[in-house]
């Protein structure tokens, strides 16, 4: 029967439909089941009987059982609030059934229903009706979010790695990375970006202590000096970072952890200009001065007869001790933490090598930042240096702070190592650096980045296993490997057995420079396994896999039209249909694949497989070459082989002559005559990571040209390194009287600085110790060029000048630039005068010229006129009349210019 509609006077009248709306029972869950009658009582819209689309088993019930009336959809746009019939099955079903039915309702069905009412909008959607039906059974978003961030995360940490995966809502590994600078936990929730800080998402009371405070909800109108006064009342402030003040947050770093605690307790929740401050302890990631090697010391090679009280007495003479702890092993080490990081530095310098009870103390810095973590050492390294330590039940964040050379993931904490994410739940664990916080020690092979947590593993000595001459791969910063579902022939995704030790993996990694094979591109690989990875290094069986540089965890982010490099899909390789490419096993007879690694940033998400355009291999060319005369597959000209910083004499071979030489038939080889890369622009980057990228030439080089280029680039690199060393400033050599140079280059000066500002900054520490200063000006941009030259009167004057400026930030303009010093090319006051007195600078305004100072007599320290030469050159296209105008406003220009790389460019 038709639905009743209330007229304005409350008298029910039958509704008259001009069109019928027929919906099959499968499509009307949650809707009123209309059974309309046309005018005259004749059904003219369908020849089918009603029984063909209406189920007799559905019993109608009154909507009065609901707490609120749910409207029916009526073609004339009015809604009924009484006597609306609903399916009784809606209330006989469980809540899960209700949602499952809703999910089974196709979107097209809903659109089909709404198409009959195109001109009228329904008063409420299906989601709104469900929300009314459910009521307040579920908590609101704020309560749920607070529970997840607060208790939920801590419970998951206690339960182990699997729970941590479920609750790691803010991990950037899964594609939530935003431009490479993402706060964890708290910062992502509040939408603040742009700081290189991993912030602990806990209240200041009871969280991991740190000397650095992350202060949110700061009024951007507050002056820096006011903030300095506010925080200095609790102790000496090491640094006050206010670059994010306009976004509502600042960073405060203290020397003494007690001062940070006092500030957090006193200021958390305090109103400052109408805003309630929110203060959290923070752990920095990219600032080495605030990240590690300060605050605490490891004491090694200590006689066991020395008690903790005696040690406390020895070390407390340098400063107040926060804690003294000792390991329980035979060769015990002692951990001593100072409240003040400055005291720890002094103790390290004063006590390292001190003989106590017939043994020389070996001290090493570490920075646990107030945690209760205490690592268990396996044994001494035999050299009295850093102890070896076990990795079981070890938080990676703590590992990174104790031993900065060990790669740690900032997403791992709470005493358990996060398991690798793969389809079969492999127990393999990995330490993967996400945000450039820590790097692998120099020479660490790629396979050493994978660590099995099922067996305690010791740190190897930094001699043999990490020898650069054996691995050919030096410091690999910013590589972010994530492991795919399959590595070689292991369906579990684990390239190592659970009992494989770190040393075994390191020994495997020593063969990395002999070559990699690209196995299992498509079809059946060497071991009959179907997958797509970069496989094992040579001279070993398939039971171990090498480092895989990408995963398919973020496959939804990749453009499938262009394809990925070695995707696991068996149907496509590099976006090319599989039937076009025969199965390929390895580059077996190819010469080494030379890879140039540059330091430009890669902007795709960490952990994502790089997108590779199809022009990488010309589809019109032959993909498989069987000619034994093939000259090899050479990507570009070789520069410095391997990763950044690697030795040029140890190239990283891809497709070595030795790679599976026994395999015949299906091999991929590219003849230099027909294998062409389109361009380095079209060729995407093969390796993930934030810093390294591939630099590939536009075509394959012939062998002679390749080695000629290699030799040329080697010589360039060697000469550049030698030149840098020539201008490096060594304070020890100055103190020993071995270096008598006096002219320095000051680099990384903020571009808004004027000569007057620079003089004021220098005179604050070193007034009267210099006789020449020159700050070059860029007249086009009306600002300084970022560096200056100064000549000290005596070489000994360099030492206090170095201590005052080198490595320090500039005070003005809130600049993040850090000053650095190097020797100038031209040395001495007389040589500098001779260099400039005939230059075009003499035609410029006096304020743009070099400045000379009296060094003796009553006028010592005052400026003296710069002598003019007899042959002054003119600057092309520039008249002297414009020089003053160019100079007057140069201090207001942008602070975004590039500085030179070393101290030998201008002078």
Curated annotation (Swiss-Prot):
Domain RRM: 211-284, 295-368
Keywords: Meiosis, Repeat, RNA-binding
Disruption phenotype: Early flowering.
UniProt-listed SMART domains: RRM (SM00360)
Molecular functions (GO terms): mRNA binding
Record region (Disordered): 28-58, 856-907
Polar residues compositional bias, start-end: 44-54, 883-894
Pfam families linked: RRM_1 (PF00076), RRM_2 (PF04059)
A Gene Ontology BP annotation from the UniProt entry: meiotic cell cycle
Superkingdom field: Eukaryota
Function, in words: Probable RNA-binding protein that plays a role in meiosis and vegetative growth.
Protein name: Protein MEI2-like 4
Provenance organism: Arabidopsis thaliana (Mouse-ear cress)
Recorded name of the encoding gene: ML4
